[in-house]
Amino acid sequence: MNILITGASRGIGECIAKNLDGTIFAIGRNEDKLKQYKNYLVCDFEKDIDKLGEYITSNNIDVVINNAGEYIYKEADKISFPEIEKLIRVNLEVPMYIISKALPYMKSQKWGRIINIGSISGVMGEAGASIYSASKSGLIGMTKAIALEVAQDNITINTINPGWVETDLGLNSVEDSEFSKDEIVDCIPQRRFVEPKEI
């Protein structure tokens, strides 16, 4: 089984890639970390989108895990247009593009699995992270729509919406926010960040 994972050089993506059986096709930005995989593509989503598309179509992908993500903590009246573009591109446009390139093969074999890593912020909204929340909410909506399109082809698509996760992205998000980690943990029913392996 050929499994494509974005954001595979760290955090949730790296943990998923290390724990799945199958042939992993790892996508990320850190070549040193990606070298642990037999098949990998160093990819900057701003510059390498055509290369990414060719990589997907040439490798007959059975399973897609859209995990790569960007986060910014800025109130709505302080965010710049380039910041908006970057988050929407990485968190919504690129997953849609990847799916569009993977679906023809999945449809041809009448089987496929797509998992998008969303966020609880896309479900509830997060003050101070409006564009992040919007991008993840869009990912959830896109997932629901595509699920209706591909159901008869025996292809499933779902979104996992974690809360705070003990990753570089999660911890950097705390540093950027106005809240301490302890204050955030007090709002989590488990009273802790989850580990990537729990996703």
Task: List each language-model region with its residue ranges.
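Substrate-binding pocket helix/loop in short-chain dehydrogenase/reductase
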Residues: E75-A76, E83-I88, I184
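Active-site loop immediately N-terminal to the catalytic Tyr-X3-Lys motif
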Residues: D77, M124-I131, Q152-D153, R191
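Active-site helix of classical SDR
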Residues: I99, S135, T143
